[in-house]
Curated annotation (Swiss-Prot):
InterPro entries: PRC_barrel-like_sf (IPR011033), PRC_RimM (IPR056792), RimM (IPR011961), RimM_N (IPR002676), RimM_N_sf (IPR036976), Transl_B-barrel_sf (IPR009000). Keywords: Chaperone, Cytoplasm, Ribosome biogenesis, rRNA processing. This is Ribosome maturation factor RimM. The gene is rimM. Pfam families: PRC_RimM, RimM. Belongs to the RimM family. GO terms for cellular component: cytoplasm; ribosome. It comes from the Bacteria.
Length: 170
């Protein structure tokens, strides 16, 4: 899946009375907000850029004061909006690591070349991610482990896996 814009946060509500907003980070790299000078805000199909002023962490949230927003009433209108960045603004990942939105939609093959289906979701379990593959029947749950996932080719849109014995019967 190759989106033009990637969601990195969601504005939940206002924070204080000076027009700051409370953002739920939708990224594994919440520290990125401190280095941003501007961000695209998307709400109900409309997108606009805002200049990032103050940024600080509060519990599990990011508090952002946009320079263009001067009141709590103006900030209230942004409630429910998403903060987005372009693909070129993503944090570079280490080799053999992928963004979830790039994994979803990949065709999955076993090492023998048999088409197992397409990745429809990624479950984040804590220990390791699990790829949900639509097989046309019962979903196949594939652990995202190096010994299982043999290759991922985003250009070709495919993943090759070596399924542990008995996994397909679960």
């Amino acid at each position: 899946m190759h989106e033009s814009y990637i969601r990195i946060g969601k504005i939940l509500k206002t924070q204080g009375n000076r027009g700051a907003v409370r953002v739920l980070p939708l990224t594994d790299y919440p520290e990125r907000f401190k280095n941003m000078s501007r961000v695209q805000v998307s709400l109900k199909g409309f997108r606009t850029f805002f200049t990032v002023g103050e940024v600080y962490h509060h519990k599990n949230f990011i508090i952002i004061k946009f320079k263009e927003i001067e009141s709590m009433a103006a900030a209230e209108k942004l409630k429910g909006a998403f903060l987005e960045v372009g693909r070129d603004e993503l944090v570079p990942l280490p080799e053999d690591r992928f963004y979830i939105f790039d994994i979803i939609g990949l065709k999955v093959y076993d090492t023998g070349g048999r088409n197992l289906g397409r990745v429809t979701d990624v479950l984040q379990t804590g220990a390791n991610d699990v790829y949900v593959v639509d097989t046309g029947g019962k979903p196949l749950l594939i652990p995202a482990l190096k010994q299982v996932v043999k290759s991922v080719n985003l250009t070709e849109g495919k993943m090759v896996v070596e399924l542990p014995e008995g996994l397909e019967e679960l």
